[in-house]
Design a protein with these regions (language model features):
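A short glycine-rich beta-alpha junction/loop motif
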Residues: 288, 487-495, 526-552
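Specificity-determining recognition surfaces
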Residues: 364, 375, 381, 514-541
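Class I S-adenosyl-L-methionine
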Residues: 12-31, 37-144, 150-153
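Non-catalytic DNA-recognition/assembly elements of restriction-modification systems
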Residues: 349-424, 545-570
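Conserved S-adenosyl-L-methionine
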Residues: 99-188, 193-194, 233, 241-243, ...
């Protein structure tokens, strides 16, 4: 490579780095500058918005300040709606005297949904917040929210993005369920969680999923509302916590059964953990795409596991994340702009290939020569709990299970005493307690507690040769109880397994080190924040009997000695 080309590339990379710095830190720098100039917080907001709207703002501050802020804003190269969202998230809670960041959906997710909607149709967001989910849609838009102060922001954004919408300040759950107006599309990122409940019987009795109940999660009711707002063949895009998709408690299963029995589930796109970190929540979420059309007895459901959405989700303020080359340079488009590191664009292509092949109506797609391979599963693949969590339908899991079944492997259930109960009555004066922190796989070091101070998670009374396996998503920690100790108790953060005999103990132990065990374990965890594996599901994990028995038996013997020494030292 010539020196001139190398120099040119270096200059481009330096320009990109400066552009990224501006895009990421522009508001912090503006805010600090205005603070140093003695400008009050609300006035700072008015100055920035005034400049963006090209309104005269010199009555609020000096010309020098205005010109400095203008110059800084001129260096920003991100979409207008993204700038508005960043500004509102930064200042909104001060300007409107209310915490508002709960209402924001990452723009790349909004753009993904908008890119699938056919222009010129009707669309509604019944829990709109600031209306981000339909920020780019060109059609007949209806936005509804019961928070009047939030709708001030919504109106502002829609007016200045040139995106007209009819906006209503209503309680959607109460006012829309009986509406005769129906829509081609409903988009939804509802309030969710066990703390967002309604006990209003007037609302509950309007819903199949609330009828006769004393309380119900608002998010569940919004799903039913969203479905009932659809025209025939209309489509719902619902961003929901993964707990809604995998929890086996009655209300969640009932919601999923309503979807499966009365509608057609087109697709499920799993979003990365912390996708909503910018809004201060670590809830794991997915996008459900559901069509108001009578379901077939069996059909294919599109799935995709999106790992990145264009933001660095583990950093404060979730700055943009860009694609890098192997040598550490930024990947650029033809205009030398850095390319966001996001997989939603590819997910769209895969889904459009799916809807084209399946001849699904009412969604936007383009025919191309490429034939990308998508993943899907059959409606008939679901068990009685109707799990929507896609991890157990992805190819990596299905291929692992296929190998296990082909080699006639048995499940963990076949090697353990399934009728064992680990529950106990707290009658002893003190207990030795094993929690996740006291396990350093495969060793453990219990802590001694008096009866009254035993942690509430201490639910399992264990004995020699019992196996404890962490229920949590992530690195699997485990240990083997190697001693006969009275009053030894384990946290219910573990799955407790009691092998049938010593041979079963060695076989189970050997399998804990295999990739197949890890894939099955991590594919079956469910939940929204702390994803865990149920005690029933772990017993359905396949394990192989063809192991090096003598090798793992010797390892177990060594662990017994090490644990004895560790506990003695402790």
């Amino acid at each position: 490579m010539s020196i001139s080309i190398l120099s040119s590339n270096q200059e481009i990379q330096q320009q990109i780095q400066e552009k990224i710095k501006n895009n990421t830190k522009f508001l912090d720098e503006i805010n600090q500058y205005l603070h140093n100039k003695g400008v009050e917080l609300v006035k700072r907001y008015n100055i920035i918005i005034g400049i963006l709207l090209k309104k005269e703002t010199t009555d609020l501050s000096s010309v020098e300040i205005i010109e400095w802020v203008k110059a800084k804003l001129s260096t920003i190269s991100i979409e207008k709606n993204e700038i508005y969202q960043i500004i509102f998230m930064f200042f909104g809670n001060h300007y409107f005297k209310k915490q508002l960041d709960q209402f924001y959906t990452p723009m790349t997710i909004c753009n993904f949904i908008n890119s699938l909607l056919i222009p010129g149709k009707t669309a509604i967001d019944p829990a709109c917040g600031t209306g981000d989910l339909l920020n780019q849609y060109q059609g007949d838009i209806t936005l509804v929210d019961k928070c009047a102060s939030v709708l001030e922001m919504t109106k502002f954004i829609k007016e200045h993005l040139g995106n007209n919408a009819t906006i209503y300040n209503k309680d959607s759950l109460k006012d829309l369920i009986t509406s005769t107006l129906k829509y081609d599309y409903c988009v939804l990122n509802p309030p969710f969680g066990t703390k967002t409940l309604t006990t209003d019987t007037d609302i509950l009795n309007l819903y199949e999923l609330g009828l006769g109940k004393k309380k119900q999660e608002i998010g569940i009711l919004f799903v039913e509302l969203g479905l009932k707002l659809l025209k025939p063949k209309g489509i719902l895009f619902a961003i929901l916590p993964n707990g809604y998709l995998g929890n086996t408690k009655g209300d969640y299963v009932a919601m999923r059964r309503m979807i499966i029995d009365k509608y057609t589930l087109l697709g499920i796109i799993k979003l990365p953990d912390n996708a909503f970190a910018r809004s201060g929540t670590g809830v794991a979420t997915s996008i459900l795409i559901i069509q108001n059309i009578k379901p077939k007895k069996n059909y294919s459901i599109f799935i995709e596991d999106v790992k990145t959405i264009g933001y660095t989700l583990n950093k404060k303020n979730t700055p943009f994340k860009y694609k890098m080359t192997p040598d550490g340079s930024y990947q650029c488009d033809k205009d030398s702009n850095p390319i966001l590191d996001e997989e939603l664009t590819n997910a769209k292509k895969l889904f459009q290939r799916f809807i084209s092949k399946k001849k699904i109506s009412n969604l936007l797609f383009t025919n191309t020569l490429s034939r990308p391979t998508y993943q899907s599963f059959k409606k008939s693949d679901m068990d009685l709990n109707l799990i929507f969590d896609i991890k157990r339908y992805l190819n990596i899991y299905k291929n692992t299970i296929k190998v296990c079944k082909t080699s006639n492997q048995k499940t963990l259930r076949d090697y353990c005493n399934t009728d064992t109960t680990f529950k106990f009555q707290k009658t002893a004066s003190q207990y030795y307690y094993i929690d996740i922190k006291s396990v350093n796989t495969p060793l453990y070091n219990p802590n001694l507690y008096p009866n009254v101070l035993l942690p509430s998670r201490g639910k399992y009374k264990v004995e020699k040769n019992d196996i404890l396996i962490s229920k949590l998503k992530g690195k699997i920690s485990f240990t083997i109880i190697t001693e006969d100790k009275e009053n030894l108790v384990a946290s219910n953060g573990f799955s407790a397994i009691r092998p049938k005999d010593e041979k079963s103990l060695v076989i189970i132990f050997a399998n804990l080190f295999t990739e197949a065990f890890k894939i099955q374990h991590q594919s079956m965890v469910t939940g929204s924040i702390m994803e865990t594996l149920s005690d029933d599901d772990i017993k359905n994990i396949y394990i192989k009997e063809d192991i090096d028995y003598d090798k793992y038996n010797a390892i177990l013997a060594s662990i017994t000695i090490l644990n004895r020494e560790l506990i003695t030292l402790g």
